[in-house]
From Swiss-Prot:
Native source species: Cutibacterium acnes (strain DSM 16379 / KPA171202) (Propionibacterium acnes)
Protein name: 4-hydroxy-3-methylbut-2-enyl diphosphate reductase
Major enzyme class: oxidoreductase
Protein task: Catalyzes the conversion of 1-hydroxy-2-methyl-2-(E)-butenyl 4-diphosphate (HMBPP) into a mixture of isopentenyl diphosphate (IPP) and dimethylallyl diphosphate (DMAPP). Acts in the terminal step of the DOXP/MEP pathway for isoprenoid precursor biosynthesis.
Organism superkingdom: Bacteria
Enzyme Commission identifier(s): 1.17.7.4
Length: 323
């Protein structure tokens, strides 16, 4: 992955794929389209995606973000975020007569369906994920009596499971692929008959972005990951960069958060971004680094992504392009 035409030993690499995934694009466009069709305000339960810039931009267009439905006025329109909600939240909205649009990523919805199917078979479900994350809360709500949360491989040894009932595992869609494999292997050591989900729960975009960083990181003195602090998949990219050989890796919301000391003695920098990050924020980082003497970025595409998801039924007649 050589940089051509640069009269310097400095190198700048740009990982691909990066940034928006199909689920994020669908969720952001859902709010934009709802504002266009129904007018402001449009309420959104939780952040539509975990990116500060996206949320602030939508707020400027008339979206109002709330933590819970009791903050939403009667008869208002509310959008459920890409991370999904529990059946209890949907019932609360129905009971109050709120108009709703569900922007849950279809890949998260798939995990919800798997949880319900396993629960209907009286299967114990080990959900690998992060406590407090909206996606984990939504999935747990589908089968609360069957699901036990497992956050790390170390949690496995303390599990108290019924040996007479089957055990299956599911996962949050934005986890580290390697750590999830380690956790599943640990579970299977104790429960050899462990049942796998029908297909990977970790989404294609999470896996692709991690694989792209793995390819880039060994060549880098520094990997900069663009994304917000509360973005799970962004945090995992920092971890993957360090585990894959980068000498240092930091997360930034935008170019303004890059510290000068990070660049001291650094010649090779890699840049990537989480799945809810607009490309403009990545370009801002590239522009800053070029202004400080790095050559134009060399991009190598690991895999082309072409997946897209249909908008929620209420909004399918006309579609706008996400900015």
């Amino acid at each position: 992955m050589a940089v051509t035409g640069a009269c310097t030993n400095k190198k700048l690499y740009l990982a691909a794929p990066r940034g928006y995934c199909a689920g994020v694009d669908r969720a952001v466009v859902t709010v934009e389209k709802a504002l266009e069709v129904y007018g402001a305000p449009v309420y959104v339960r939780k952040q539509i995606v975990h990116n500060r810039h996206v949320v602030e931009t939508l707020e400027g267009r008339g979206a109002i973000f709330v933590d819970e439905l009791d903050e939403v006025p009667d008869d208002a329109l509310v959008v459920f975020s890409a991370h999904g909600v529990s059946p209890q939240v949907k019932k609360e909205a129905t009971d109050r007569g709120l108009r709703t649009i569900d922007a849950t990523c279809p890949l998260v919805t798939k995990v919800h369906h798997e949880a319900k199917r396993f629960a209907n078979q009286d299967t114990q479900i080990l959900l690998i994920g992060h406590a407090g994350h909206e996606e984990v809360e939504g999935t747990t709500g589908e089968a609360p009596e069957n699901i036990t949360l497992v956050q790390t491989p170390a949690d496995v040894d303390g599990l108290a499971l019924d040996r007479d009932r089957p055990v299956a595992w599911l996962s949050q869609t934005t986890l580290s692929v390697d750590e999830t494999v380690e956790t599943v292997d640990r579970i299977r050591d104790l429960h050899p008959q462990l049942i796998d989900p029908p297909s990977d729960d970790i989404c294609y975009a999470t896996q692709n972005r991690q694989h792209a960083v793995k390819q880039m990181a060994p060549q880098c003195d520094l990997v900069i990951v663009v994304g917000s602090k509360n973005s799970s998949n962004t945090g995992r990219l920092v971890e993957v960069a360090l585990e894959s050989g980068a000498k240092a890796s930091y997360r930034v919301d935008n170019a303004g958060e890059i510290e000068e000391t990070w660049l001291d003695g650094v010649s090779t920098i890699g840049v990537t971004s989480g799945a809810s990050v607009p490309e403009a924020l990545v370009q801002g980082v590239i522009d800053l680094l070029i202004s400080k003497g790095w050559p134009p970025a060399e991009e190598e595409t690991l895999i082309e992504e072409s997946l897209s998801f249909a908008l929620p039924p209420q909004l399918r007649k006309r579609r706008t392009t996400a900015k």
